[in-house]
């Protein structure tokens, strides 16, 4: 449950045009949005309709300006409208938007992913959901098995079989699963607590020779931010292989965000299959999955496991993604770490001064705030926090010109575009935000 801010905390900015356009949107779009978290459902108040972004800033259609700490939920690692990415997109678009045929850009982007990670072959798709859906299908086809093991609070896109205990998307609405996901769809999905190797071993013992794969976020970012405990991902791979199953590591969020090599660069664990998105897209609809060459060889047209897409490998998206990855050189990541350290330091200082119990959940450059004492290690821990403090905290930041994810269960993302002036704006907004969190009342 969340404590909704009182009326004095909501919409002190002029948001009349956002309200008008949002009302217009609700007439033609369910809930007025095309992804639920954008509706401000868990924090209340008027969702902002964004007009443009540049560097570290966003502007809504009413002219309100914000420091951007959402980064489009991860892709905008270089900030908004980076000139090199914009130029690459414009050049590619001028040559044609889509051909339904092979292009050079597909191979260039795939080569770049292979060069920086442990995957040997790559298939390009349009979204993270497509990537995880296809990776699971491939794992089932390769192993000849049906069951999939996933973790509570880990989100792998809106795939029916993976929406059980799926974290932020459904947690925002306090729904354990999505209506429309049938029992048959989820019947082969086994769900266990995150960071619990004993539960994983018990699941394999209960279903010997039946589990096709384990799928896990390389570091969880959809129950808030929860890093895997030391050795967790390596143990998952060992357990899976001992039973003839595969390990799928979902790096849609962590890939090329947490290090030059993604989470693989942090713990050195190579998934048999790995999914990528967000940063790899540069902000356009693109994603990928890849892995061991022998596994990928089962994918059509080389093998019998079917996967296809009219717009997969779209040349404009390939240009955007390649430009994004080329900018994300090894020198970028220490700067991102510095920005994350500086930001979390300011948050801790403000919340501590206001007497608010909290813990900063970190996974390298990704983080979230747990409004409780101590670190959360799984979804139950994150749900047990004082999440009702988040909505007043969020709105005070928004009024102070700082745009953060509108859910206690979403991860915050820094960009390389943040400036000293941005941190001054953030610091000024954090004091009233911390006070708002401190004065929040637990819902009855």
From Swiss-Prot:
Chemical reaction(s) catalysed: (S)-4-amino-5-oxopentanoate = 5-aminolevulinate
GO CC annotation: cytoplasm
Cofactors (names): pyridoxal 5'-phosphate
Subunit structure: Homodimer.
Any one GO molecular-function label of the UniProt entry: pyridoxal phosphate binding
Family designation: Belongs to the class-III pyridoxal-phosphate-dependent aminotransferase family. HemL subfamily.
Localization, UniProt: Cytoplasm
Record Gene3D superfamilies: Aspartate Aminotransferase, domain 1, Type I PLP-dependent aspartate aminotransferase-like (Major domain)
Pathway(s) it belongs to: Porphyrin-containing compound metabolism; protoporphyrin-IX biosynthesis; 5-aminolevulinate from L-glutamyl-tRNA(Glu): step 2/2
Highest taxon above the source species: Bacteria
Record keywords: Cytoplasm, Isomerase, Porphyrin biosynthesis, Pyridoxal phosphate
GO terms under biological process: protoporphyrinogen IX biosynthetic process
Modified residues (N6-(pyridoxal phosphate)lysine): 278
NCBIfam families given in the database record: hemL, PRK00062.1
Top-level EC class: isomerase
Enzyme Commission numbers on file: 5.4.3.8
InterPro entries named among the record's database cross-references: 4pyrrol_synth_GluAld_NH2Trfase, Aminotrans_3, Aminotrans_3_PPA_site, PyrdxlP-dep_Trfase, PyrdxlP-dep_Trfase_major, PyrdxlP-dep_Trfase_small
Name of the protein in its database record: Glutamate-1-semialdehyde 2,1-aminomutase
């Amino acid at each position: 449950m969340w404590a909704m801010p009182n009326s004095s905390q909501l919409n002190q900015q002029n948001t009349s045009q956002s309200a008008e356009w949002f009302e217009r949107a609700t007439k033609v779009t369910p809930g007025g949005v095309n992804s639920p978290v954008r509706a401000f459902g868990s924090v209340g108040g008027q969702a902002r309709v964004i007009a443009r972004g540049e560097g570290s800033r966003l502007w809504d259609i009413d002219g309100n300006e914000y420091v951007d700490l959402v980064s489009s939920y991860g892709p905008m690692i270089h900030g908004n409208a980076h000139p090199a990415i914009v130029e690459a997109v414009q050049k590619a678009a001028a040559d044609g938007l889509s051909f339904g045929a092979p292009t050079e850009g597909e191979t260039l982007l795939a080569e770049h992913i292979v060069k920086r990670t442990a995957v040997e072959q790559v298939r390009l798709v349009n979204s993270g959901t497509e990537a995880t859906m296809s990776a699971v299908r491939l794992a089932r086809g390769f192993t000849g098995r049906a069951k999939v093991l996933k973790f509570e609070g880990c989100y792998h896109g809106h795939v029916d079989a993976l929406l059980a205990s799926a974290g932020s998307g459904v947690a925002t609405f306090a729904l354990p699963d999505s209506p429309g996901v049938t029992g048959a769809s989820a019947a082969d999905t086994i769900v266990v607590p995150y960071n619990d190797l004993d539960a994983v071993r018990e699941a394999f013992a209960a279903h010997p020779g039946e589990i096709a794969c384990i799928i896990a976020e390389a570091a969880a970012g959809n129950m808030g931010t929860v890093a895997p405990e030391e050795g967790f991902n390596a143990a998952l791979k060992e357990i899976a292989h001992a039973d003839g199953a595969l390990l799928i590591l979902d790096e849609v969020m962590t890939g090329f965000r947490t290090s030059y090599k993604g989470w693989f660069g942090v713990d050195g664990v190579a998934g048999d299959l790995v999914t990528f998105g967000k940063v790899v897209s540069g902000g356009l609809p693109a994603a990928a999955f890849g892995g061991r060459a022998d596994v990928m060889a089962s994918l059509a047209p080389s093998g019998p496991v079917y996967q296809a897409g009219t717009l997969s490998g779209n040349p404009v998206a390939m240009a955007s993604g390649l430009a994004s990855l080329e900018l994300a050189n090894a020198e970028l990541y220490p700067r991102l770490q510095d920005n994350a350290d500086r930001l979390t330091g300011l948050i801790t200082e403000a919340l501590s001064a206001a007497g608010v119990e909290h813990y900063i959940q970190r996974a390298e450059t990704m983080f979230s705030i747990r409004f409780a004492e101590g670190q959360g290690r799984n979804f139950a821990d994150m749900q047990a926090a004082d999440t009702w403090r988040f909505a007043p905290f969020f709105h005070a930041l928004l009024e102070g010109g700082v745009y953060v994810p509108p859910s206690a269960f979403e991860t915050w993302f820094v960009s390389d575009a943040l400036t000293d002036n941005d941190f001054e704006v953030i610091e000024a907004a954090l004091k009233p935000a911390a006070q708002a969190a401190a004065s929040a009342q637990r819902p009855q």
